[in-house]
Amino acid sequence: MDLQRGFVFLSLVLSFMIIETTAYRERQLLLLQPPQETAIDTANAVVTVQDRGLKTRRPEHKNAYATMMYMGTPRDYEFYVATRVLIRSLRSLHVEADLVVIASLDVPLRWVQTLEEEDGAKVVRVENVDNPYRRQTNFNSRFKLTLNKLYAWALSDYDRVVMLDADNLFLKKADELFQCGRFCAVFINPCIFHTGLFVLQPSVEVFKDMLHELQVGRKNPDGADQGFLVSYFSDLLDQPLFSPPSNGSVLNGHLRLPLGYQMDASYFYLKLRWNIPCGPNSVITFPGAVWLKPWYWWSWPVLPLGFSWHEQRRATIGYSAEMPLVIIQAMFYLGIIVVTRLARPNITKLCYRRSDRNLTTIQAGFKLIALLSVVAAYIFPFFTIPHTIHPLIGWSLYLMASFALSSISINTLLLPTLPVLTPWLGILGTLLVMAFPWYPDGVVRALSVFAYAFCCAPFVWVSFRKITSHLQVLIEKEVLFPRLGDSGVTSGFSKLY
């Protein structure tokens, strides 16, 4: 197969994957188009809430678990999936409370309908709260709309509300939280409480006062809900620890919640087990880097608890939205493997004139393309695999995709098989080392991964050297670059002038 056909083959492969990935993302973006009927005046919407509170449709219980959704980030779909899993997991625990989603007006109606009709949530639509801290020098734009969480105080249909972030993982029922006082939260940080879960007593007056504090510029270190609420409830650290009364009575005032209601996942990674004696071990939270949230398939086995979240998803909403694309990609990659093994396309006999002064540049460029094709084989699949698929499926598809794309480089560019696949074997080994379930603690696990990576590094370097030296040998022997007029050159091959 000549140069032209080889590049056509590579172009078809990459074009198909780009089209499929773009089509999948466009299907998600179609869901993100804001409904036209929600274009209402912001000031009027907030005034209405201040006057009447947020009313849910046919409240069934006196208490509620609530979470929020808003648009405008690159990860809107992922957080929508996380919200669905949270709602479904609470339903599966048979909590005695309504499940409320505080959704901004630009959340797609299709998502709202799914939350209401399939997941059993009560969705209330709100206008985004304007964030006056967005011009702070340390402000992170992903926190721009987190002040929508303040709407929880306007849920006047309920006596108590447990406000939740979407990245909470419930291990068991926690309805005793509704016995807590007017405001209760967990101190993950010794001095700063965490707003991923807190209990509140709805009050329109408190909601009005919070909006007033926003207008006058109350101090807010991070410009998000966390900094504002820590400033607003600055005395919480001095309050007693919550212990639910055995008679079911409801407490008053402000209280600190035991750590078991907001167990930071990083504590688990130290011991690889939970051992928090103060309070029930009920809820896991995943603060930290957004790209390592548990719903991303690559978060496991890097972070072991990601698998627990995906098992909860598998038992609730499943993966039907992502599976069609996964099947298409798997069949496509399998086809690439078969075709490259049977047809063995290769770019050979790239001809040049004996007097060409740019030969060195051409050869260097060709070596660079060959090396980039190997690197791309391991990077490109990360952008095509659906982000929220189960880790076992995600990593299996990644290994298949990287193997298939590597086989194109091996057969098309005449590269040595083992050196090209050395990173593939290294990645597989890393996954097995990280997923090993019998480590005594997280320190031993981390040291094992480090030792494995240390041992693998020389093999990767040797493989890189072998690939570059092999390319140089091919060029020197004129396997890839025979001169015009040599007997091995036929008129059907491409020529460089």
UniProtKB/Swiss-Prot annotation:
Q: What is its main location?
A: membrane
InterPro entries, per the entry: GNT1/Glycosyltrans_8 (IPR050587), Nucleotide-diphossugar_trans (IPR029044)
Q: Which EC numbers characterise this protein's activity in its record? A: 2.4.1.-
Where is this protein localized, as stated in its record?
Membrane
User: Which amino acid positions bind Mn(2+), per UniProt?
Assistant: D165, D167
| Cofactor(s) of this protein | Mn(2+)
Q: Where are the transmembrane segments?
A: 3-23, 319-339, 365-385, 388-408, 418-438, 442-462
What membrane topology is annotated for this entry?
Multi-pass membrane protein
**PANTHER family reported in the protein's UniProt record:** GLYCOGENIN SUBFAMILY MEMBER
Q: What is this protein called?
A: Putative glucuronosyltransferase PGSIP8
* Record organism: Arabidopsis thaliana
Gene behind the chain? PGSIP8
